[in-house]
From Swiss-Prot:
One of its GO terms (cellular component) is mismatch repair complex. The lineage of its organism: Bacteria, Pseudomonadati, Gemmatimonadota, Gemmatimonadia, Gemmatimonadales. This is DNA mismatch repair protein MutL. The gene is mutL. PANTHER family: DNA MISMATCH REPAIR PROTEIN MLH, PMS, MUTL, DNA MISMATCH REPAIR PROTEIN MLH1. The keyword DNA damage applies. This protein is involved in the repair of mismatches in DNA. It is required for dam-dependent methyl-directed DNA mismatch repair. May act as a 'molecular matchmaker', a protein that promotes the formation of a stable complex between two or more DNA-binding proteins in an ATP-dependent manner without itself being part of a final effector complex. It comes from Gemmatimonas aurantiaca (strain DSM 14586 / JCM 11422 / NBRC 100505 / T-27).
Length: 607
């Protein structure tokens, strides 16, 4: 006797419901997406008891006639596709014909619908069984009411959370849909009151302002970048604001909200060297790729997708966010064009407080005085070294290369016309200058660290740096772990300008070193860098380069307490202005702080 039997349709429907209908929020998502697929421009949602007793979705979409309303309750009945070929690049939210019958199998469901040409239809279903059909007077559109969700599946019912928890999940689901379809008016009522009301808007910022509040949206910079066939747009949190509010992450791929840790990690990688380790930014990103490059039919709830070629896509996302942060950092956040001009009322040759400066310190383009006195820095514009980005353009990415070249050219032009204001050093730690709108302070170590990081990263990715041979070579005796760290990064150290030979056992003979500034302590910097790189052998080449560049920049930069000459201060100012992300060092700390005259007046009681 056979022990294998085909399950009854009611049982099969409940199994399918377990994949599609996890909780009330899942029902809301599926039914609202059906409304949007029907062309609705207005969707009203009614929730009672967190969706446990009632979920009602009413729309003004195309509606259905009587036959389609009944047929829609059958598994795999859909109007979205008719062949397997249409699965490639499908743009509708739904296409499997599973959600509505799955919901009907675990609830008491009622459908009222009317198409443009037909009369209204009423359909009632009890736990998957059709109990009533008839006619009803109504306008075009569809209203789906779901009562007593999971009433016939006690095992599922007992896993329902409190009404408050289920309501929060519904709000989260609706926020994702609201961001996705900004052209639709959504109204959500909960227990008799209007809880959410989002009129149709034209921009992402406007929708997020309605969802989160205008103040929250101010924390974000715009992302809009095209690389080849990939278009990345949206909003990314400003580095200085990361960690100051609730973290929110929303990823939209080809008009569908999805979960993809790889793309989110790629976007977060753009923040490396701008925020402290362990902190994660808020992101709202929209990614558009050709339909044939993405498979949406890989998850029961269509919450995950599969990409044909993931690596170029992740690179495009990272580069888009990095560019957005760079443009913000170099203009809106710092405002070099605004803050670099010296006050017209101040006599030339005097900085804040009337302290005289050397006449040479006021020239628009002074020769670097020690701080960048390497052959490369003497022979090339500082901007060409400092504008290096964390992702070097490759031969197969012509668009990216052209954009990077344009950024460098723009930076070079700005550096040619940049007027360095009179600078003074405070406590051998900060540089300060005055502007019509306030006072600006620069942390000399953090600023130099940022400059060196971008220079070193560019050197590691594009070629070797010049070095200076030592009259008396250094002998370093390393421990086993330090020696292993050196072997893991040997080629990178050579690119940075070190010439190092083995000297027996774990000893090294250092013949030549880079010289980022006259006070550079090569032996200490090399030892400290190797100590910080212990255990980094297994990382990718790109991660190793970033880690080494950040660590070496931190160790090699001038320190608090180092006296700087006027020429060195000007050189640092110019180099920082030419970096991609001037506002933060490699640890995410601020390099620049500005105090407006209004703030100073308030502190002194003048306002």
């Amino acid at each position: 006797m056979s022990r294998i039997a085909i399950l009854p349709s009611a049982v099969a429907d409940q199994i399918a419901a377990g994949e599609v209908v996890e909780r009330p929020a899942s029902v809301v998502k599926e039914l609202v997406e059906n409304a949007l697929d029907a062309g609705a421009t207005s969707v009203d949602i009614t929730i009672e008891d967190g969706g446990r007793t009632l979920i009602r979705i009413a729309d003004n979409g195309s509606g259905m006639d009587g036959a389609d309303a009944v047929l829609a309750l059958s598994r795999h009945a859909t109007s979205k596709i008719t062949s397997a070929e249409q699965l490639v690049g499908v743009r509708s939210f739904g296409f499997r014909g599973e959600a509505l019958p799955a919901i009907a199998s675990v609830s008491e469901l009622q459908i009222e619908t009317a198409s443009e040409d037909g009369s209204g239809t009423l359909v009632r279903v009890q736990a998957g069984t059709l109990t009533e059909t008839g006619q009803v007077a109504r306008r075009q559109g569809t209203t789906v009411s779901v009562h007593r969700l999971f009433h016939n599946t006690p095992a599922r019912l007992k896993f329902m959370r409190s009404a408050r928890s289920e309501w929060r999940a519904i709000v989260d689901a609706m926020q994702a849909i609201g961001v996705l379809r900004r052209d639709v008016h959504f109204t959500v009522r909960h227990d008799g009151r209007v809880a959410l009301d989002w009129p149709a808007v034209s921009t992402l910022r406007a929708r997020l302002a309605a969802l989160w509040g205008a103040a929250d949206v101010e924390r974000f910079v715009d992302v809009d970048d095209v690389q080849g066939v990939v278009h990345v747009s949206g909003l990314a949190e400003r580095p200085a604001d990361v960690g100051t509010a609730t973290r929110r992450v929303l990823l939209i791929v080809n008009g569908r909200v999805v979960r993809d840790h790889g793309l989110i990690r790629a976007a977060e990688a753009a923040y490396r060297s701008t925020i402290p380790a362990g902190m994660r930014p808020s992101l709202v990103l929209q990614v558009h790729v050709p339909g044939g490059d993405v498979d949406v039919n890989v998850h029961p709830a269509k919450a995950e997708v599969r990409f044909r070629d993931r690596w170029p896509l992740e690179r495009a996302v990272e580069e888009a966010v990095r560019r957005a942060l760079g443009l913000f950092d170099a203009s809106a956040g710092i405002g070099w064009r605004t803050w670099s001009a010296a006050p017209a009322s101040r006599e030339p040759g005097h900085a804040l407080g009337g302290i005289p400066l050397e006449p040479s310190a006021l020239r628009a383009a002074p020769a670097p005085e020690g701080l960048f006195a390497t052959p490369a820095a003497a022979d090339a514009n500082l901007a060409q070294h400092a504008i290096a980005t964390a992702t070097a353009p490759t031969a197969d990415d012509l668009t990216s290369a052209m954009q990077v070249d344009a950024m460098r050219a723009e930076a070079a032009r700005e550096m040619e016309t940049l007027v360095v204001p009179p600078l003074m050093q405070l406590r051998k730690t900060y540089l300060m200058f005055e502007h019509d709108e306030g006072v600006v302070l620069i942390d000399q170590h953090s600023a130099h660290e940022r400059v060196l990081y971008e220079q070193f990263l560019g050197v590691l990715e594009r070629g070797e740096a010049p070095s200076q041979r030592l009259l008396f070579p250094l002998t370093l005796h390393l421990g086993p772990q330090e020696a292993d760290a050196f072997e893991a990064h040997r080629d990178a150290f050579v690119r940075l300008g070190f010439e190092i030979d083995h000297f027996g056992g774990t000893s090294l003979l250092v013949q030549a070193v880079p010289m980022p500034h006259p006070r550079f302590d090569a032996e200490r910097c090399l030892r400290d860098t190797l100590a910080a790189l212990i255990g980094d052998r297994g990382a990718s080449a790109a991660a190793k380069h970033e880690r080494l560049a950040a660590t070496f920049a931190c160790k090699a930069a001038i320190k608090a307490g180092d006296q700087m000459s006027p020429g060195e201060m000007q050189a640092l100012y110019r180099a920082l202005a030419a970096t991609v992300l001037p506002a933060h060092d490699v640890h995410g700390r601020s390099t620049i702080v500005r105090l407006s005259w209004d703030e100073l007046d308030r502190r002194f009681g003048r306002k």
